[in-house]
Amino acid sequence: MSVKVRDSLSGGLVEVGGDGRVGIYVCGPTVYNHIHIGNVRGHLFWDVAVRFLRSRGYRVKFVWNITDIDDKIINRANEEGVSWKEIVRRYTDSFHERLRLLGIGMPDVEPRATEHIPEMISLIEELIRRGHAYPAPNGDVYYAVETFPRYGALSKQRPEEMKITEKGQTGHKRNPLDFTLWKASKPGEPSWESPWGPGRPGWHIECSAMVEKHLPGGADIHGGGSDIRFPHHENELAQSCGAHPDRPFVRAWAHHGMVRMAAQKMAKSVGNVVDAREATLKHGRDAIRMWLLQSHYSQPIDYSDEILEEKRRSCERLLRLYREISRSEASSPLSDRLAGELRERFDAAMREDFNTPEAIAALFDAASGAGREISSRPSAAGEFASLKEALQELLGLLGFDVAGERVSEVDGVRIRHAGEAPGEVLERVARRERARRRREWPEADRLREELLREGWAIEDTAAGPVLSRR
């Protein structure tokens, strides 16, 4: 069976991986700040998509980039009085830490823009040779959009309707819509030598060069947020197809919807962001996965504490049903039927544009089927081995925590708990245990009651506290 992706350019479903191989390129972060929970959406979704493809035998090469030179990075460095390289190091580490908290795997290749300056210069030279780009007297180089007749096809805009996105002087441009391929250096800014003088690359040329370097046959899927469909992806398309008109660039463009807060796009420029680390520690990894995966990746999604709490309860319900049958060693005909239907529905959903909401619905339906049987006949709990195996495999594929008892150590306190527990909950359990050791009983009781109100029970044992869901 094939895997199909809804292509933003054509609007149709495009089959990928016909030869058993899939190359995926996703635009990564510009590392000048901590990533927020809206930034996480694309990385978490593509982590799941790649897991699914590999589970079905596809050989996947997965690439996302790090934009490590940009005006925002330079401005942040100047504000803090440190080098731009220190800003890049700090926020790349921060990005990786937040991915680990969410259980998001790393790509096969994570190229950095500054490691590909020669490839960018070669690409710009080819665009100039073909008449798609021109150097300006001040050392800048611009792409001439009027030389590319398909400009606007990806974003479904006519050039005369487009908003000019580049700030600053346009006196050297032939057309206000022309965009920068190479920026002449300014005093004190990082720069690299080029045929047009010292400078640095524009944002859009970076991804074109890195796709060409790491996926030389073109990307089967190019992912990114719907907010960069224009101008970034539109400009990538113009650059790569302008330089290599006879070479495939992207077979399917896949854009994920924006995360909204109070009906407004979550963005640093708006000031309504929630740090991905803060959200993960507060709500837990599984709740965030359930929240993001129960909506189709292409649709916008709303964030609030209330929504995340609802998703946490939903996830806990599913995992509780799984744990009810987790000790099964025999398989009844009902178990085999539910397992077979689950695998079939899950596979069909994921092969049709990675439909995670339908895949999760299949998980709930199968688990609920087992739950109804156990409610009417408790002894049936040991007869669902085949369904247990299917649930374990598919929940794990989506990145949910299906482990049994865990032990977390927080500030010297060992805490046992079933499955995942949010970091801030574990911190309060540790505070309570330290209060008990100091015989500060009112504080220990206060923390216990606070956690009880939030649905967490604590059992005090000689080996330390045991945390569980009520």
UniProtKB/Swiss-Prot annotation:
It catalyses: tRNA(Cys) + L-cysteine + ATP = L-cysteinyl-tRNA(Cys) + AMP + diphosphate. The lineage of its organism: Bacteria, Bacillati, Actinomycetota, Rubrobacteria, Rubrobacterales. GO terms for biological process: cysteinyl-tRNA aminoacylation. A motif ('KMSKS' region) lies at residues 265-269. This is Cysteine--tRNA ligase. Belongs to the class-I aminoacyl-tRNA synthetase family. Zn(2+) binds at residues 27, 207, 232, 236. One of its GO terms (molecular function) is ATP binding. InterPro entries: Cys-tRNA-ligase, Cys-tRNA-synt_Ia_DALR, Cys-tRNA/MSH_ligase, Rossmann-like_a/b/a_fold, tRNA-synt_1_cat_dom, tRNAsynth_Ia_anticodon-bd. Monomer.
